[in-house]
């Protein structure tokens, strides 16, 4: 089966409120809670997580909680007041009263989160006990892919919470990723010619959504404050106000806002809100600098989403490698090079530039300092494009660089999925040791 760019946008690009890892935990709990009798008091919540989801959700702020974080809090919020039908916007209905109730569950040690340290691949398994009822849910492979619901041990066969599937029962996104791994850069570039009016409107909505986060970050000085600091440095004349600076400011400020738990959705890309910020905002900054028209901006962002999905199909959904840098960064690079008038060869060369530059950036979980990495990715995306447009591209003799952009991306996928397994374990161990030490000091 061949896919269109409309299919890719439908499956890979969607609004997400808050970091996608605690949101996935909340979604799993909310889905299980739909099986309980209304008004039934929750006694216990148990959640089992894969290592990468555990790592990514450990320290990031949860929307509508006034800056609070915690895997257990995310589960409690989802179970008590989340709307599972909203998928990655599951926490939209949360109120201060719900937060207080969730905190009470956590304080009463009624929520247990366990690490499945040997599991590979995304997994959220949730069990909620309420009186004589036990409700269970499973999310696998993708953050919103609910694959199982059980009540008192009996499998629920039909529900609108289950994803639609293709023939043979294969999940649509899994099938798409398999297809993506076999296409070329030329195919991806050609896809944007098929964007219709509704696609362009959807892409513009994503641009507007992520720009709102950037404005929130700049106006409220939230999170680590990377965006506001970059802006202050420019005001002092210490750094230049060019399109690289603008790309950095917009992307970092949006990350500041999102990682601090701002109550605003991000338009995600390939399953991640931060990917969406990186895939969209540097492109917007360059388009503004070039005075590109709205249609070209939206077409470029469409290309960015496709390339981001292509890279993620090789690296996997969650890994030790920072995919904001190499996947969404590659998407933004391709889009920027296209806006600059680049040929398919120059676009591929630019993508290879950024991958060779940032392939070693690790993911040490979602948290405020992600803004630093998104700042770097935005800057390098513009630089990689400008380098390629001026004849500078890395060579096949260099490290993991292959004979084409596609081969280089495949090599990076091998690095991510095979070469960084122990790195991932070490990162998580350091984070867990910190958590244990901080608790022992309290």
From Swiss-Prot:
Transmembrane segments: none annotated. GO terms for biological process: L-cysteine catabolic process to pyruvate. One of its GO terms (molecular function) is L-cysteine desulfhydrase activity. It comes from the Bacteria. Belongs to the UPF0597 family. This is UPF0597 protein HRM2_02820. It comes from Desulforapulum autotrophicum (strain ATCC 43914 / DSM 3382 / VKM B-1955 / HRM2).
